[in-house]
A protein has these predicted regions:
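C-terminal motif of bacterial Sec signal peptides marking the signal peptidase cleavage site
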Residues: 6-9
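Bacterial signal peptide processing site
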Residues: 11-14
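Blade/loop signatures of beta-propeller domains
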Residues: 29-47, 54-90
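Extracytoplasmic beta-rich repeat domains
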Residues: 91-110, 138-157, 183-199, 222-244, ...
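Structural signature of WD-repeat beta-propellers
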Residues: 120, 167, 207-208, 252-253, ...
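WD40 beta-propeller blade core
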Residues: 126, 173, 213, 258, ...
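Short loop/turn segments that connect beta-strands within beta-propeller blades
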Residues: 129-132, 176-179, 216-220, 262-265, ...
Length: 430
């Protein structure tokens, strides 16, 4: 974000060339007719009457026993989860090192087998009782001779009885989820600020040099790599791939979404989330959000100003919207929910992307989410607010103060919500 600000500030205080009058310039003749802007601004989004007229159909809520990937599942899609109408704080616990000037806490907690797993900004993995918050174990992943300040970023995933962690130290670690014992460590040569997705005994993640890696979950041996377009300036957003039917879909900092064959890493199709005609400062950094695979369709959005729906198997574009977001879309029933960088929460028709309803969330702080549970869309904000929004009509039905900043989306498992605050406080709510 600082890059966009600094570029915008270069000309402050100087007159623009267009403001200097040319005495020899002839008056321009304006042609008749309606003038339609070529570049659609984020503010031009509005509710489509035909889409709004159709009632939103939510699938019945289902209780998920676990949340094993950063996006909930390997496809980053969980549908409609079970949760009570109101949430109340049950317990809170300190999980380690929070955000600081050295790095941000960005790893989403996981839930499985009665435990909540966290990775703090210092590179320490810990497990806590989901029932009480009591610590079960903790393991530092900081290599010897490291200062301990480069381990921020990375994330966790669970698959085939193993817990996997990526770290800013450029390592991937296999861990026993019951004891915290390290099973193996694999060096990848570059820091890994993003989270992994584990599926079918394989681990997929993107390192800071825009390389997608596939490792064997049993021993950490590299199976294949695929290089994306390097991007020197990024938002350091923490995303993870989506795994579907024979393909893994990865998001790269330059704004590219690429589908690869999970067997050999060959690219099947490629899409860009950057608006080529974008002139706003926000479009300079194109970091995408976590992609979602649902019903044979890939949904993706990014900071470059574009949201797309494409066929998972062929990459055929189904629809496009001009929309700027760093948050993973949530797909359920016939609707896709997404919040943009200005705090507009939208319900889009899954078939064509038309806006069914739009709600401006309160305040000016950044919002993270949504997660659909108990008929509501749940989001947390950088100023410490938790809101519940009716998924059918967009009305804000509940607001809770968490008392601390939050930059990580909520997690729901076993009918309980878990929120990891920026100061490394884990909060459980029923």
């Amino acid at each position: 974000m600082s890059l966009a600000v600094s570029l915008g500030g270069c000309a402050s205080g100087l007159p623009s060339l267009s403001s200097i009058k040319n005495p020899f310039k002839k008056a321009e003749e304006k042609l008749p007719g309606e003038r339609i802007p070529v570049i659609l601004d984020q503010a031009s989004d509005s509710v489509d009457p035909s889409a709004a007229a159709k009632p939103i159909s939510l699938p019945p809520p289902a209780t998920n026993a676990s949340w094993t990937e950063p996006g909930g599942s390997a496809s980053n899609s969980l549908g409609h989860l079970a949760l009570g109408d109101r949430v109340n704080k049950v317990w809170r616990v300190d999980v380690g090192t929070g955000s600081s000037s050295s790095g941000r806490l960005s790893a989403i907690p996981l839930v499985a087998d009665g435990k909540v797993y966290t990775l703090d900004a210092g590179g320490t993995v810990a497990a806590f009782s989901a029932a009480s918050g009591a610590k079960q174990w903790s393991t530092s992943l900081t290599p010897k001779n490291e200062k301990g300040v480069e381990g921020f970023g990375g994330g966790l995933s669970l698959d085939t009885g193993r817990l996997y962690a990526t770290t800013g130290y450029g390592t991937v670690v296999g861990i026993n989820p019951e004891s915290g014992a390290v099973l193996w460590t694999q060096k990848v040569g570059e820091p890994v600020r993003s989270s992994p997705t584990a599926s079918g005994g394989k681990i997929y993640f993107v390192s800071s040099d825009s390389v997608l890696h596939c490792l064997d979950g049993a021993d950490g041996q590299e199976q294949w790599t695929a290089r994306g377009v390097p991007e020197p300036a990024t938002l350091l957003s923490n995303v993870s791939p989506a795994v579907g039917k024979g393909l893994v879909v990865a998001a790269f900092p330059a704004g590219d979404i690429v589908a690869y064959n999970i067997g050999n890493g060959e690219a099947a199709w490629r899409e860009s989330l950057s608006r080529t005609s974008e002139t706003s400062a926000a479009g300079i950094l194109a970091d995408p959000a976590r992609p979602v695979i649902e019903g044979g369709v890939v949904y993706a959005v990014g900071h470059g100003g574009k949201m797309i729906a494409v066929s998972e198997s062929t990459g055929e574009r189904l629809w496009t919207r001009n929309l700027t977001s760093t948050q993973m879309p949530w797909v359920a029933g016939d609707t896709v929910y997404v919040v943009d960088i200005t705090g507009k929460l939208m319900a889009l028709a899954k078939g064509d992307g038309k806006v069914r309803w739009l709600t401006q969330l309160p305040g000016t702080a950044r919002w993270n989410g949504p997660v659909l549970a108990g008929g509501k869309l749940w989001l947390v904000s950088a100023d410490g607010s938790l809101v519940g929004v009716d998924a059918r009509n967009g009305q804000v039905s509940s607001t809770t103060s968490l008392g601390t900043k939050v930059f990580v989306s909520p997690v729901v498992a076993g009918g309980r919500m878990y929120i990891l605050a920026d100061n490394a406080t884990l909060i459980a709510l029923n």
